Amino acid sequence: MSYIPFPDISPEIFSVELFGATFALRWYALAYIAGLLIGWRLVLRMIRSDRLWTFGAPMTEDQLERLLTWVILGVILGGRLGFVLFYQPSHYLAHPLDALKVWEGGMSFHGGFLGVMVAVIAFCLRERISILPVADLLAAATPPGLFLGRIANFINAELWGRPTTLPWGVAFPGEAAQTCPGIEGICARHPSQLYEAALEGIVLFAILAILIWRRGWLRWPGAVTGAFLAGYGCARFLVEFVRQPDAQFVTPGNPLGLAWEIGGYGLTMGQILSLPMILLGLYFMLRARRTA
């Protein structure tokens, strides 16, 4: 079977030892930092562009700086809590202190999304500003962070795809990745992280940019948020067909790792969590156009 060897890239950019402890800067952490900084600059540019708004930007630059702290907390706390509740609740109920070990990995986008949503609502209520226009700004600035995060997933050799015989299949390191039932030798897999980087990052960013800068969708509160939710939900739903499900869902009787199954068909946990996003996104877009 032909495959592409996994590139020899360390998950750690560099590490230092201080007082007997090792501290490392990982690509995943850098992706979070860079994504937040790029998103902040994009929101700042949209706030400063008067032509995008009918009655002016929904918040000031000073408010944006304060919001950034709330968003960071929402992403980290929501992402970790979402992983604990959605993917491994039984493990963390038995070992609750493991939920604090964020350095061991385990973040959920859907949980991070809910965390940011709660943070934005709380911030807007405190600052007495409209929620939907602020949500539109953050939605427009999110795809670059998603792109970088998925690239970091690839570098970390995690969240790889299902087995494939396609010529661009990648032989990810590790016995779990390279051993597949019914396949002799090294098992090549879909580089599903790169599929998601392209769809959730590049394609979704391009669509939102056109809607904002060419179509003026920021004048309709909630429209950009709806487009982001529906776009991300569709992208994630599609990629789930070739993405290897989380190990806790895979059993001998359920090799596809379906979280819900009926009549031989079913959905993965990622697809189940994406469907409400798609429906909510469609609702926001329809609501925005009706109230325009």
From Swiss-Prot:
Topology of the protein relative to the lipid bilayer: Multi-pass membrane protein
Positions contributing to a 1,2-diacyl-sn-glycero-3-phospho-(1'-sn-glycerol) binding: R150
Enzyme class: transferase
EC id: 2.5.1.145
Membrane-traversing stretches: 18-38, 67-87, 105-125, 129-149, 193-213, 222-242, 266-286
UniProt pathway annotation: Protein modification; lipoprotein biosynthesis (diacylglyceryl transfer)
Keyword terms of this UniProt record: Cell inner membrane, Cell membrane, Membrane, Transferase, Transmembrane, Transmembrane helix
GO cellular component, one term: plasma membrane
Compartment annotation: Cell inner membrane
UniProt GO MF annotations: phosphatidylglycerol-prolipoprotein diacylglyceryl transferase activity
Gene Ontology terms describing biological process: lipoprotein biosynthetic process
Biological role: Catalyzes the transfer of the diacylglyceryl group from phosphatidylglycerol to the sulfhydryl group of the N-terminal cysteine of a prolipoprotein, the first step in the formation of mature lipoproteins.
Assigned protein family: Belongs to the Lgt family.
The protein's name in its UniProt record: Phosphatidylglycerol--prolipoprotein diacylglyceryl transferase
Source organism: Cereibacter sphaeroides (strain ATCC 17025 / ATH 2.4.3)
